[in-house]
C-alpha cells in the first residue's frame, strides 16, 4: 500500500535505462497495489515489445508454504521466453499469480486469503502454467509497429471515481467535482 505514482515513474525509468540489456523484466511487488502498478505501467511504457511481469506472494517467501517461489520462478521463465525468431512470447505488462498470466491492465485483486488472489474478468488469461506453460497466443498483444520504447512520466493524480446510478442527484455530482 506504499506504492505511489512516483514509484511507477522510477520503475519506468529503470526499465527504460536497462531496456537493451535484458530480454524481459520481473518486478516483485506487494499484492495490495500490484494491479494498480501493472495497469499504470502498461500505459506508461508505449511501444513495449518485451515482457514486464509483476508477481508476488500471499505468504512471505521464507514461509514453508509460500506461493512466492513458484510465482517468481515461473515469472522469470515467462519473461525469458522467446519464439523461434528470438522475439518475446509475451511482449506486454502482465501479472503472474497462482499459475495464471494475466494482462496487467485487465487484472484485479479479488482475494486476500487464498493463493488464487487475482482475476481477469473481462479478458482471458494469457498463459497457464502447469507441467508446461500454455500460451494463449491469440490474446497476447504484439507490438507490430517498429516504434522504439517511449516512456511516459507525466501522470495526473487529480482524478475521482464517480459511480453513476439511476436517481443520483445533480448536487451530489457537483459537490464531488467541486463545481
Where is each model-derived feature located?
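Loop/turn elements at helix/coil->beta-strand transitions in domains of secreted/extracellular proteins
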Residues: 50-51, 179
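Short, charged beta->alpha transition segments
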Residues: 14, 38-43, 170-173
